[in-house]
Each structure stands twice: as C-alpha cells, then as structure tokens.
C-alpha cells in the first residue's frame, strides 16, 4: 500500500520528503523501490518531484536488509531515517494544508475480492465495508489484517475497524485443512532466518520450558517475520509460539 499512493499523490509525497529532510538538516533524500516490482506491473519513474528513485534488491523481509545497507552506506557519515511513502503524504498534508491525519491507506485484496485496490479509508471504517466496496465475491474462510505473513486474523468483521496500523485487509478462501506434523529436523527454518537464529532449537527449548536456553539462543533478536513458519514442511507454528512467549514475558507472566 505504499507504491500506489506514492505514484498517485507524488507531489504530496515529494513535499513531505522535503519537509522531513529540512527538519533533519539535510538535502540528501532518496526514494527506495524494490527491484522485483517490474515496469510491466506499474510504471516506476526515475524520480518524483525531483527526488531520485533507486531500485533496491533483497528478499523478504527486505526492510531488514535495507536498514543494514543504509547503516553501511552512512557509517561514519551521520545518521539516516527510513520512512514510508504514506507517512510522507500525511506529513505534507498536516504541515502544509493543516489537515490532521484522519485516514490511512489500505490494500484490500485476496481471492474473495473482485476488485483489489488501494483505498484511502477514514479511521474507524468497519472492515466489512471496505470488503464490500472492493467487491466481496464469496464468504472468506480467513480475513487477515496486515500482510499475509505478519498480519493477524479476525472473525468479527462488523466490529473490526480500520486503525492507523491497518495496512491491508486480505479476504481469503481456501479449503485446506490445518494440520501439523512432528518436526523432521530439516533445518529450513534456520536457513531462511534473516537474523541467523535457529528457530527449531528455540521451539524445542520453549516446549521444554528451558527459559535460560531460549534466551541464550537469541529469542529477543527475532523480528517476527514468520519466515520460519512459512517454510516449515511440518506446519509447526514456530513464529506463533515465539511471539506468545515474548508477550507473556512482556506482561510479567510465567511462560
């Protein structure tokens, strides 16, 4: 939900970037766009409002790699700030037009949506109304708020409202039954972890209740990208159990 608003409202986006740069006391600003977004999907210009666009590579979760690249690029040269395009649009509206943020940009998609699109929705809009607006074609088995990997499922569509943090609404129907098998020790979760952790070992120690081992294995470094759960052939809820542990620890509960 960043590319669409950036291209549709490029003047506001560029204006917001300039305001942010001025506040930081710099003129060095660049728009970063993932290289895998081809021009056949959407035409990406070379700049917006005179601010250059740079195509960057990397795989999911690309933000982590992007932050590492920026940290290396500006090492010893000063600090940097990474902001979303939609945030820059709202910054421009607030600073130049005096409009407080009362809307947010939401991607509405999924195989139950007839006309997927980016919608600028007022805060507090019922999620069900967004789905109706974009042509809900059949009853979904799952509705996810947020991305397909890191989003959260909801069942109360009438009372679930659009919030500032709502980036996407995905209505999905699948006939697959949920299942999980015993871990086969394939090591795929370790291979895909962008933080270099061993999710399989962390999960084993979590289930044993070995808190010390869990901490030593670096559970606090987990970014909750859920790559481990996605790649697992046994459908183990690796990321889910790690998140539950961290939530309990944060709340002062005994995991």
Task: Report each predicted region and the residues it spans.
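Iron-sulfur-cluster electron-transfer modules
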Residues: 1-39, 46-51, 56, 60-62, ...
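Conserved active-site and cofactor/substrate-binding residues in soluble primary-metabolism enzymes
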Residues: 5-15, 24, 39, 83-90, ...
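Hydrophobic alpha-helical positions that pack around
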Residues: 6, 23-127, 133-138, 147
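Short glycine/threonine-rich loop-to-helix capping motif typified by GTGT followed
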Residues: 38-46, 153-161, 233
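Active-site gating/interface segments in enzymes
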Residues: 70, 136-184
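Structured core elements
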Residues: 107, 118-120, 144, 170, ...
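Ferredoxin-type iron-sulfur electron-transfer modules in oxidoreductases and energy-metabolism complexes
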Residues: 168-180, 190, 194-230, 234-255
């Amino acid at each position: 939900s960043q590319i669409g608003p950036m291209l549709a409202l490029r003047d506001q986006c560029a204006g917001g970037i300039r305001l942010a740069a001025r506040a930081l006391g710099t003129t060095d600003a660049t728009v970063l766009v993932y290289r895998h977004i081809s021009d056949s999907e959407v035409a990406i210009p070379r700049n917006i409002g005179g601010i250059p666009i740079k195509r960057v590579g990397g795989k999911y979760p690309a933000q982590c790699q992007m932050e590492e690249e920026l940290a290396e690029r500006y090492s010893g040269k000063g600090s940097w700030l990474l902001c979303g395009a939609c945030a820059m649009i709202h910054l421009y509206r607030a600073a130049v037009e005096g409009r407080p943020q009362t809307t947010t940009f939401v991607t509405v998609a999924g195989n139950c949506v007839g006309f997927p699109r980016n919608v600028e929705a007022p805060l507090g809009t019922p999620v069900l109304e967004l789905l109706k607006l974009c042509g809900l074609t059949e009853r979904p088995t799952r509705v996810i708020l947020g991305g397909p990997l890191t989003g959260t499922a909801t069942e109360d569509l009438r009372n679930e409202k659009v919030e500032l943090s709502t980036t996407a609404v995905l209505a999905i129907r699948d006939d697959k039954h949920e299942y999980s098998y015993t871990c086969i020790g394939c090591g795929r979760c370790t291979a895909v972890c962008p933080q270099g952790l061993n999710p399989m070992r962390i999960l084993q120690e979590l289930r044993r209740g070995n808190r010390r081992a869990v901490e030593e294995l670096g559970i606090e470094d987990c970014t909750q990208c859920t790559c481990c759960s996605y790649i697992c052939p046994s459908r183990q809820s690796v990321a889910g159990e790690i998140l539950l542990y961290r939530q309990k620890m944060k709340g002062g509960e005994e995991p």
